[in-house]
Curated annotation (Swiss-Prot):
Gene Ontology BP, a term: endoplasmic reticulum organization
Subunit architecture: Interacts with ATG8 family modifier proteins MAP1LC3A, MAP1LC3B, GABARAPL1 and GABARAPL2. Also interacts with ATG8 family modifier protein GABARAP. Interacts with CANX.
Family, per entry: Belongs to the RETREG family.
Recorded name of the encoding gene: Retreg2
Name under which the protein is recorded: Reticulophagy regulator 2
Bias type Pro residues, positions: 507-521
Role summary: Endoplasmic reticulum (ER)-anchored autophagy regulator which exists in an inactive state under basal conditions but is activated following cellular stress. When activated, induces ER fragmentation and mediates ER delivery into lysosomes through sequestration into autophagosomes via interaction with ATG8 family proteins. Required for collagen quality control in a LIR motif-independent manner.
Lineage: Eukaryota, Metazoa, Chordata, Craniata, Vertebrata
Bias-annotated ranges (Basic residues): 250-260
Amino acid sequence: MASSGGGNTGAGGTSGLGLGLGLSLGMGEATGDAEEEAAAAEAVGRLATSLWLRLRGWEAVLAAAQRLLVWEKPLHSLVTAATLNGLFWLLSSSSLRPFFLLSISLLTYFLLDLWHPRFLPDVSAPPPEEPHSDSEGAGSGAQPHLLSVPELCRYLAESWLTFQIHLQELLQYKRQNPAQFCARGCAACAVLAVLGHYVPGVMISYIVLLSILLWPLVVYHELIQRMYTRLEPLLMQLDYSMKAEADALHHKHDKRKRQGKSAPPAGDEPLAETESESEAELAGFSPVVDVKKTALALAITDSELSDEEASILESGGFSVSRATTPQLTDVSEDLDQQSLPSEPEEALNRELGEGEETELASPEDLLSAPPALSKQALDTEEEGAADKEALLQLSSPLHFVNTHFNGAGSPQDGVKCPPGAPVKTLSPEAVSGDLMAPSSTLSPQLCLAESGPVTPLSPSVLPSLPQDSPQPLAAPEEEEALTTEDFELLDQGELEQLNAELGLGPEMPPKPPDVLPPPPLGADSHSLVQSDQEAHAEVEP
């Protein structure tokens, strides 16, 4: 037991030692990285300070050069660029050698450095010990939007140190992998040799000079970002259209391939095309949607409402939304307006309602008969109720009177009406459906109802017009007369003559037994009938 416990203790101690060693190594690496960063920052600071001490006398010249390079004054920058281009092509077309030009340039630099204190005295302030921040360098005379001398020195120092680091890595790679380094070096030199064979060296030098002159302008005004912002929608649209065309071509190619595979042999009859039963074939008609492409396509579309949708939305006609179906809001109002009756209909209904209230009294008041009635009297009362219902149906403005075209409204059961009897049907103007017809064209009963209180009428006077009852067949002579003289308006004399010719003389209808005779019509009733006849005469053409 003790030995096993000692073994476990030893294993636990080993694992703890490994964990501690790993932590110490990690901490050591972090400490080493921090020390390297601190050393690099210190080296950048020392190099920037040394450069600033050398360039502090050229501060005004550097600021003017920056203004020319960023085209702060376009006219001055244009003149400078034209001068440099002319000088370059003049030197390139001369017979002087490049080494001679390089030696002349170095001689000019040394002479300027030697004669600088005499011709360009130092008028700048005494330098501080070390510019540690950008705010200290901002007050050195440069513009806020341009680089000051300390900032320029710091950028130059960082660039130089970065170049040194890459050079050290390249030398280390050469020592570790000499064969790969030789192969890559030979490939790079071959590319440069081919480029120099097809492109002259003067052109390459001119491209380098233009890059040096135009690069500050591009960086300062952010021309690349602006150009990319303007071209991004066009590029996305082009990419999306090319993707759609490629998908369409691929789909057509697959369809032709499937048709070629499913083509019948040479001797067989061609089969009719049927629906695809394979899920793979059906999937070809519904391509997979790329989320990124869809998002880019939606980004270039206009999310605002069109002019037509905006006008409809402002007028309140539709409730327009992008993700819903447009809903009508005026249809309900139109239906409500259609359901409301018009003013002529309301006036006519009001007049007819008042006439019905006056005319349609109780059967007891109309008949004024004793309480004990005979069987025939009860039948007469039932006929009066039927006549009242028929009158209610005829009083509706939308009711169609089928007896108007069935023989000029002849009475039923062979009962003949005398010429002087009141008309028992509505006039043609009232039946024609014209709601604007005057009330004088209605039947005499309706005119009596509108004129005020009337004397009670017996059921025999009320019209007996069943709605759907068939009319008796007329004689052959009567059918010929109706066929030849259909829809012809006649005056009272012609009507009496026609009735006499047809054998419809003035005969009184048979009176039922044990029934009181109807009261004679008064002067008011005859005058109303006469006025109705005069109205018919005025309507005649």
